Amino acid sequence: MSRRRGIMSSKLKEELAKELGFYDTVQAEGWGAIRAKDAGNMVKRAVELAQQQLKQ
């Protein structure tokens, strides 16, 4: 079975990682090295941004 393609673009994920302060970890060790809490915060922020765009 193939992996599901992600919804967030790589660019958006990188921007969110920079904003949330764990981009250095992503660069050094890859996405698999981030903490679950950081991943959750990234998704939460992405949802907030999407909701803001829908209001406009």
UniProtKB/Swiss-Prot annotation:
Keywords: DNA-binding, Sporulation
Site, as annotated: Cleavage: 15-16
Gene Ontology MF term list: double-stranded DNA binding
Gene3D superfamilies, per database record: Small, acid-soluble spore protein, alpha/beta type-like
GO biological process, one term: DNA topological change
Pfam short name (any one): SASP
Domain of life: Bacteria
Family from the record: Belongs to the alpha/beta-type SASP family.
Free-text function comment from the UniProt entry: May play some important role in either sporulation or the dormant spore.
Protein name: Protein SspF
Gene that produces this protein: sspF
